From Swiss-Prot:
Protein's name in the database: Protocadherin gamma-A10
Gene behind this protein: PCDHGA10
Biased composition range(s): Polar residues: 820-845
Role description: Potential calcium-dependent cell-adhesion protein. May be involved in the establishment and maintenance of specific neuronal connections in the brain.
Membrane topology, record value: Single-pass type I membrane protein
CDD domains: Cadherin_repeat (cd11304)
Residue intervals of the Cadherin domain: 33-137, 138-246, 247-351, 352-456, 457-566, 574-687
Segments crossing the lipid bilayer: 697-717
């Protein structure tokens, strides 16, 4: 709003007076100049009111210089002075209604002090009203209560509305929502306040409309127009202007005679449109005889009619009762109640169980009587005709007997295993309408007979148990069920008689006869047997007993309980050490020997690996991890010792792994004389510190001489024996015909094999030392040991007359299998470079050949004496007796490739020709080649 300018003038006399006061120091008063402004209410803070600097005649910058400021009169500061612009502005929002209430004019006065002149200026600011408030009622809802019999024209004052604004913005008028019963009239009090009055225009009827809802509106005269409303609820009070009215003028009801006392017959209802005490209706009998009054009971408030005494159709079949209804005033109404009593079937049949034959066996024949019943009804005629029935699903039926008796008989076969007892309900029903019935309940037990054998849950069982189990351990349990009961269902378990490897099954397995738990009586060995088959019998205790069998397969699981067993080289029985030969000319990778081992376990537990555990010359030899082949890792040097000691370990892959070791002695030499010359060095002296060089030389010379002399003697004896043998064989013809191959024991030499000529020497298994057969010589490697030259027992041969021709006919020796032969190129050593078409000749001259033949004879003598550490029975392939006929390599087919013929690259195979009993192909050719070399 624009501020009004100052309308007063400053008098010159006053200015002079002020100056005079200042001069004389006399107190002074403010001048008479007054500055007035006018603003509307609700301005924002900082709104412009007036320009003080202009009205005071001062420049804006002089306001601060002269100390112009507002002097408050104790009221909250509503205005502030802007020293820069010289403008008077609002210090906050100004609410006129809060500041001046209902005053017609609202003025705010304060002074402005000019300090340098010590002069005050009065400021008067008028705050004008705006229409910022609507008329409001103190309550949101107004309740007005009017009696319905009030006459028209009656006035009812209503509370007025309040509007804090003034003037035209204040409350100006009231309006009432349109209706046909009320109008509005506005009255004014002495102070000018207007209030409304509600005027009844037409009479009210509470039964027509009990509550009238009106809306009263109060409006002011501002711009924009504001108004307030209030909901007026007019409640019409009741007046007793209506009489009770029954819902029916006449009530009819038919009731059976056997209704119990207290039964509600019907309820009469009368209504009164009035409310409160005027609408409360009470009921009572009117003009009722005393005899009838005792029969019925009427509730005066609800109108319920009940029987107070038993009704009898034969006594009274019809009642007429008059009921009156009265409200709280003088109005009443009447109605009739007609009650018809009907004859009904009020007696239920009586059912009695005369006899009950329980329990009944489940094998009882059809038609067997299990119960006898009697029925009776006190009613007569149709109401006294009684029929009996049972549920259709029961295996019984009712048969009518004489008079009022019924028999309960078996209609279908009984099975106790399906239903062990029957809860039977017999219902007796009369012919009344509605029919009455009576039920009798009893339980019939079914006795068991032994008609079900025990049954196992499975057709067959199988279980697994690790070997080496604890004795007496529970290994499995079987369970059989018998649907019979008591003794007929008591099951006894047993094992069927059987033998395992000639031993009764009962010595291996036992079973708890009550629980069916099986126990191991022995510790099982997977290597002995893998599986146990048995029959478990379950018998009940009935008479006669019934039983059933089930097969049980017990599989023994292998555990790593067997360490690897080394087949080759076999451990010697005399404590000596086996010797293998490696020529100094051997290239890297030369096959020296092969360690052959087996494991009696299976699967991973029998998977073997080889490794070199210890060597006297590290790095000289290597062992195949999976083959066991001992090969040279590098070329042999002159500085390498003649005797090399190797410790080879064989380990399986079980958990935990088991292992075995073997010590190999490898002789490094290029010729037999060199080997023989140094054989004495294979034995270590008992005490190296006390050994003497001279003693060594003497022993060496003596040993060489002994060996040379022994070889000469053996060679001469061999020549004579061969000549004698040829004569003997020619004279005997086929004397060994009919002797099976299993009667011959192959002598495969001693522990050190040399590449040279060799003769096959075979003994019959029952000949001991007395019988020798020398077939066509073949070429093989021969094992030489120190024991060979020191053997004292001579090889004994009987003359021709002592051959057991009649006991054991001689047959021609079968030619050697070609699988056991290999060419010179396949043999380790320097001879491997020769022509592979013919067998090689490692001895350089006839003398070496003769010497080797003598060694073979000595080896044959050891085999005949049973002192050979490598010789074995027939069919054992030179293995020890432990792996004889009862444990051949057929038992360990996975290790056939590991059987190694010392000194060669050949491995054992099961030739088809040998299995068929036929001579292998190429055998004759080998014999011819051998003969040619002998002639040379």
């Amino acid at each position: 709003m624009a501020a009004q300018r100052n309308r007063s003038k400053e008098s010159k006399d006053c200015s002079g007076l002020v100056l005079l006061c200042l001069f004389f120091g006399i107190p002074w008063e403010a001048g008479a100049r007054q500055i007035s402004y006018s603003i509307p209410e609700e301005l924002e803070k900082g709104s412009f009111v007036g320009n003080i600097s202009k009205d005071l005649g001062l420049a804006p910058r002089e306001l601060a210089e002269r100390g112009v400021r507002i002097v408050s009169r104790g009221r909250t500061q509503l205005f502030s002075l802007n020293p820069r612009s010289g403008s008077l502005v609002t210090a906050g929002r100004i609410d006129r209604e809060e500041l001046c209430a209902q005053s017609a004019r609202c003025v705010v006065s304060f002074n402005i002090l000019v300090e340098d002149r010590v002069k005050l200026f009065g400021i008067e600011i008028e705050v004008t009203d705006i229409n910022d408030n609507a008329p409001t009622f103190q309550a949101e809802n107004l309740d007005v209560k009017i009696n319905e019999n009030v006459a028209a024209g009656m006035r009812f004052p209503l509370p007025e509305a309040i509007d804090p604004d003034v003037g035209v913005n204040s409350l100006q008028s009231y309006q009432l929502s349109p209706n046909k019963h009320f109008s509005l009239r506005v009255q004014s009090r002495a102070n000018g306040v207007k209030y409304p009055e509600l005027v009844l225009e037409h009479s009210l009827d509470r039964e027509e409309e009990a509550i009238h809802h009106l809306v009263l509106t109060a409006s002011d005269g501002g711009d924009p127009l504001r108004s307030g409303t209030v909901l007026v609820s007019v409640t019409v009070f009741d007046a007793n202007d209506n009489a009770p009215v029954f819902t029916l003028p006449e009530y009819r009801v038919s009731v059976p005679e056997n209704l119990p006392v207290g039964t509600q017959l019907l309820t009469v209802t009368a209504t009164d449109r009035d409310e409160g005490a005027n609408g409360e209706v009470t009921y009572s009998f009117r003009k009722l005889p005393d005899t009838q009054l005792l029969k019925f009971q009427l509730n005066k408030y609800t109108g319920e009619i009940k029987i107070s005494e038993n009704l009898d159709y034969e006594e009274t079949g019809f009642y007429e009762v008059e009921i009156q209804a009265e409200d709280g005033g003088a109005y009443l109404a009447t109605a009739k109640v007609l009650i018809t009593v009907e004859d009904v079937n009020d007696n239920s049949p009586e059912l009695t169980i005369t006899s009950l034959f329980s329990p009944v066996t489940e094998d009882s024949p059809l038609g067997t009587v299990v119960a006898l019943l009697n029925v009776h009804d006190l009613d007569s005629e149709q109401n006294g005709q009684v029929t009996c029935s049972i549920l259709a699903y029961l295996p019984f039926k009712l048969e009518k007997s004489i008079d009022s008796y019924y028999r309960l008989v078996i209609h279908r076969a009984l099975d106790r295993e399906q239903v062990s007892s029957y809860n039977i309900t017999v219902r007796a029903t009369d012919g009344g309408s509605p029919p009455l019935s009576t039920e009798a309940h009893f339980t019939l037990q079914v006795a068991d007979i032994n008609d079900n054998p025990p049954t196992f849950s499975q057709v067959s069982y199988f279980t697994y148990i690790p070997e080496n189990n604890a004795r007496g351990a529970s290994i499995f349990s079987v369970t059989a069920l018998d649907p019979d009961s008591k003794e007929n269902a008591r099951i006894i378990y047993s094992l069927a008689e059987d033998t395992i490897q000639g031993v009764p099954l009962s010595s291996y397995i036992s079973i708890n006869s009550d629980t069916g738990v099986l126990y191991a009586l022995r510790s099982f060995d997977y290597e002995q047997f893998h599986e146990l088959q048995m029959q478990v019998t379950a018998s009940d205790s009935g008479d006669p007993p019934l039983s059933s069998n089930v097969s049980l397969s017990l599989f023994v699981l292998d555990q790593n309980d067997n360490a690897p067993e080394i087949l080759y080289p076999a451990l010697p029985t005399d404590g000596s050490t086996g010797v293998e030969l490696a020529p100094r000319s051997a290239e890297p990778g030369y096959l020296v020997t092969k360690v052959v081992a087996v494991d009696r376990d299976s699967g991973q537990n029998a998977w073997l690996s080889y490794r070199l555990l210890k060597a006297s010359e590290p790095g000289l030899f290597a062992v195949g991890e999976h083959t066991g082949e001992v090969r040279t890792a590098r070329a042999l040097l002159d500085r390498d010792a003649l005797k090399q000691s190797l410790v080879v370990a064989v380990q399986d892959h079980g958990q935990p792994p088991l292992s075995a070791t073997v010590t190999l002695t490898v002789a490094v030499a290029d010729s037999i004389p060199q080997v023989l010359a140094d054989l004495g060095s294979f034995e270590s002296p008992a005490n190296s510190e006390t050994s003497d060089l001279t003693l060594y030389l003497v022993v060496a010379v003596a040993a060489v001489s002994c060996v040379f002399l022994a070889f000469v003697i053996v060679l001469l004896a061999l020549r004579l024996r061969r000549w004698h043998k040829s004569r003997l064989l020619q004279a005997s013809g086929g004397g060994l015909t009919g002797v099976s191959g299993s009667h011959f024991v192959g002598v495969d030499g001693v522990r050190a094999f040399l590449q040279t000529y060799s003769h096959e020497v075979s003994l019959t298994a029952d000949s001991r030392k007395s019988h020798l057969i020398f077939p066509q010589p073949n070429y093989a490697d021969t094992l030489i040991s120190q024991e060979s030259c020191e053997k004292k027992d001579p090889l004994s041969l009987l003359d021709d007359s002592k051959f057991p021709i009649e006991d054991t006919p001689l047959v021609p020796q079968a030619p050697p299998n070609t699988d056991w032969r290999f060419s010179q190129a396949q043999r380790p050593g320097t001879s491997g470079s020769q022509n592979g078409d013919d067998t090689g000749t490692w001895p350089n001259n006839q003398f070496d050949t003769e010497m080797l033949q003598a060694m073979i004879l000595a080896s044959a003598s050891e085999a005949a004496d049973g002192s050979s550490t490598l010789g074995g029975g027939a069919g054992t392939m030179g293995l020890s007796a432990r792996y004889g006929p009862q444990f051949t390599l057929q038992h360990v087919p996975d290790y056939r490739q590991n059987v190694y013929i010392p000194g060669s690259n050949a491995t054992l195979t099961n030739a088809a020709g040998k299995r068929d009993g036929k001579a292998p192909a190429g055998g004759n050719g080998n014999k011819k080649k051998s003969g040619k070399k002998e002639k040379k």
